[in-house]
Amino acid sequence: MDSSDETGSSFMSFWPHLQSDDLARNGITGFPYFSFIILNESDQILELDGTLVKIWLLVPSHQPATHFKFEETKTHGPYVITGDYPRSLWQKSASSLPASPPCLWYFLPTLGCFCDHT
């Protein structure tokens, strides 16, 4: 399914499979680690096997983000997805990270990506 959000970027509204070693293409540059809750097109939290899912952005800070790693909160199983997800990503609290980056990114459904330096 090819859909478009308010920012004009496509995203998948249905994820039947999460394949390892696939790449997520979203053009984000910046810090190497983020923690996200995944939202579907209805802004509902995506679940895997009934557990909330964390997503970790794995990329050097000087390169575009190309690889995501999913972790289930209970099983910690790795998953990687494909697609463009500016609308489908919602950041968890930075306090959940062992070493949170100084800049917090917010992916809002209609406004895009903002950086808060406070």
From Swiss-Prot:
It comes from the Eukaryota. This is Putative uncharacterized protein encoded by LINC00518. The gene is LINC00518.
